[in-house]
Amino acid sequence: MADGDIEIKAGFVDTDLDDRKLTMIDDLNNPLAIVERVYLIWWHWADFHLHVISPHIDTITPAIVIEPELIPGSNDHEFVYSIHDSGSKLSTSKSQDMFSAGMSMCKLFYTIEKMVYILVERLKSGGVSMEAEVQIAFAGHEIAQRKAFESIINLPYNVVVTNFDPGIWGEKYLQNVKRLADKGYGYPPESPRKIYMHPVSSGTTARK
């Protein structure tokens, strides 16, 4: 009986492997499935880039790597990824955590908030007034660009994103903002926001 059981189980294994092979072949021949898989991979190491078009900002070569800083009054570091600072361009990505962060965008969103803070400090140090038009451009993962746009439109500065069309998502976002405000929850806080400087407890570190 034991030998028979082994043969039956082996048959199930062979059938399962055959089914997997057929599924894999079908996926390889399906352009939509390939695009979906590529998008999923990109989501795991999503990148984001912020370019300052106007006013002119000198390029830094080689780029400076801004690492997470120690939060004052604690032993924790900022909950952000490394930022590559090229002067007129700021870049980051989830690549260092791509296997542990999964599809979570929390840490990337916090990093984007820090990038917006760096942008504002750069405008201040350059003597740019809040009324002067500042032109920037985005690159990277679509969801990261949406987060950056949400932060930018809540700045006191006159910052214009030249290459991002919020489209239907933007309309829904504004509708949700108004709906929450009408219910008494208020409007989103003004940017830049230093939420990345709050210590992240051990129970929430998985949100990378």
UniProtKB/Swiss-Prot annotation:
<dbReference type="GO" id="GO:0015031">
    <property type="term" value="P:protein transport"/>
</dbReference>
<keyword id="KW-0813">Transport</keyword>
<keyword id="KW-0653">Protein transport</keyword>
<dbReference type="GO" id="GO:0005737">
    <property type="term" value="C:cytoplasm"/>
</dbReference>
<protein>
    <recommendedName>
        <fullName>Type 4 adapter protein LvgA</fullName>
    </recommendedName>
</protein>
<keyword id="KW-0843">Virulence</keyword>
<comment type="subunit">
    <text>The T4BSS is a complex nanomachine composed of several subcomplexes. This subunit is part of the Type IV Coupling Complex (T4CC), a subcomplex composed of the DotLMNYZ core and the IcmSW-LvgA adapter subunits, linked by the C-terminal tail of DotL. Interacts with DotL, IcmS and IcmW. Interacts with various effector proteins, including VpdB, SetA, PieA and SidH.</text>
</comment>
<comment type="function">
    <text>Component of the Dot/Icm type IVB secretion system (T4BSS), which is used to inject bacterial effector proteins into eukaryotic host cells. Part of a subcomplex which recruits effector proteins and delivers them to the core transmembrane subcomplex. Is a critical subunit for binding a subset of effector proteins. Recognizes more than one type of binding motif. May be a critical factor that confers host specificity.</text>
</comment>
<keyword id="KW-0963">Cytoplasm</keyword>
